């Protein structure tokens, strides 16, 4: 059995032994496959709570928070067998956009873009612009914004519902059962 840390690198969930790698393996788990969680959103909750409570406040930065959250979501997708998965991916003919995660379903040839944000504030606008760019090239592309802040997610969902956002299909809080629904689709 391959060590989880080897899987983190070999699947490109993490690009190597760096600060994110060290943080994930030290404060969350050295083997993410052994974490007991009955569904994806509980896995996200467990991992994020471990990071929040165990990692010293002085070590946390907004950048590290974002990278750790991306790693948590990516390891969750891996655990659920959602592959292939491309991290920090560029899509042909979609210039100047690095998608947090790009997926492809077997039955579809269109990409699924996933934008991952620890908090939304104004960041949902960037995610929507990236989604519009992807849909401009790949008409049937799907785009999802995943965040941790349920209250912010509810606010931005209203903008999606009233038509203020054009590219995003859904906005989901990763620590809710709605995330489980997305994973099962």
Spell out what each predicted region is.
Residues 150-185:
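Domain-level recognition of nuclease-like catalytic cores that cleave nucleotide substrates
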């Amino acid at each position: 059995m391959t060590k989880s840390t080897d899987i983190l690198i070999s699947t490109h969930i993490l690009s190597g032994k760096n600060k994110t790698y060290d943080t994930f393996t030290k404060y969350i788990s050295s083997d993410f496959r052994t974490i007991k969680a009955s569904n994806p959103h509980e896995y996200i909750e467990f991992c994020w709570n471990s990071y929040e409570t165990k990692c010293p406040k002085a070590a946390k930065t907004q950048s590290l928070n974002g990278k750790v959250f991306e790693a948590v979501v990516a390891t969750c997708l891996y655990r659920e067998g959602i592959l292939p998965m491309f991290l920090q991916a560029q899509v042909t003919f979609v210039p100047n956009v690095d998608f947090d995660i790009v997926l492809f379903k077997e039955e579809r040839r269109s990409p699924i873009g996933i934008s991952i944000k620890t908090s939304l504030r104004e960041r949902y606008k960037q995610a929507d612009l990236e989604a519009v760019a992807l849909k401009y090239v790949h008409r049937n592309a799907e785009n999802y914004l995943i965040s941790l802040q349920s209250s912010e997610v509810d606010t931005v969902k209203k903008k999606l519902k009233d038509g203020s956002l054009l590219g995003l299909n859904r906005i989901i809080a990763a620590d809710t059962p709605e995330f489980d629904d997305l994973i099962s689709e």
